[in-house]
């Protein structure tokens, strides 16, 4: 394949598309394998972008010890971590997977990607008008509408807005940005942290 200049990772399944086990396998472990694989062929000066989600900022947080485990455990050993094996709720699996994406990118930025002179970041979209979002709306539309109404933007985002933010992170204008996340959510997480709305359906 040769050296790769740019890499964008978009694979993932939502809580209404897959079981907790499958979400962790695809969104968390699959992302780890991809970061490792492309970290071996990314060109010097290259850049990568992993599309995550605003849910990585939501409940439940991993403990500091669990965060370190997820960040540093090799991809082929992640499925054995107790903090992941115990998850049975697809919503929690999705939240933890998206938190893990950012942790794994932090590690990659300072190890294989950084050692090759390349950058890697995540972008965390809020509610964006995509087929995946429609699946979630159909399953829990009222809850999503309450969340949208509570945010400062009071609307959903568009693919073009995420594309523009992603293009910036991959561009030379972002050459000093690596190992971090760009939250593009219309203020959803700010509203959540300030008590404007509460998450539901994450009791187990």
Annotate the PLM regions:
Residues 7-8:
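Conserved hydrophobic beta-strands of the Rossmann-like cofactor-binding core
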Residues 13-17, 40, 44-116, 125-129:
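Catalytic loop of short-chain dehydrogenase/reductase
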Residues 23-24:
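A hydrophobic alpha-helix adjacent to the NAD(P)-binding/active-site core of NAD(P)-dependent oxidoreductases
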Residues 72-84, 137-151, 201-203:
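A short C-terminal helix-loop "cap" of Rossmann-like NAD(P)-dependent dehydrogenase/epimerase domains
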Residues 178-204:
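Short C-terminal tail/terminal secondary-structure segment
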């Amino acid at each position: 394949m040769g050296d790769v200049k740019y890499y964008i990772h978009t694979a993932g399944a939502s809580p209404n598309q897959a079981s907790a086990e499958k979400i962790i396998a695809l969104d968390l472990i699959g992302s780890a394998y991809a970061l490792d694989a492309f970290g071996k062929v990314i060109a010097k000066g290259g850049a990568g972008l992993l599309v995550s989600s605003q849910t990585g900022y939501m409940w439940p947080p991993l403990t500091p010890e669990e965060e370190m485990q997820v960040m540093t455990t090799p991809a082929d050993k992640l499925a054995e971590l107790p903090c992941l094996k115990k998850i049975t709720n697809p919503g929690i699996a999705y939240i933890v997977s998206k938190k893990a994406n950012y942790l794994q990118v932090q590690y990659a930025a300072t190890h294989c990607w950084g050692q090759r002179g390349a950058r890697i970041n995540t972008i965390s979209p809020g509610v964006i008008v995509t087929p995946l979002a429609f699946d979630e709306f159909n399953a829990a539309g009222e809850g999503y509408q309450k969340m949208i109404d509570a945010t400062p933007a009071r609307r959903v985002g568009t693919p073009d807005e995420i594309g523009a933010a992603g293009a910036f992170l991959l561009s030379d204008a972002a050459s000093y940005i690596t190992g971090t996340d760009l939250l593009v959510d219309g203020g959803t997480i700010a509203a959540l942290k300030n008590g404007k709305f509460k998450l539901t359906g994450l009791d187990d």
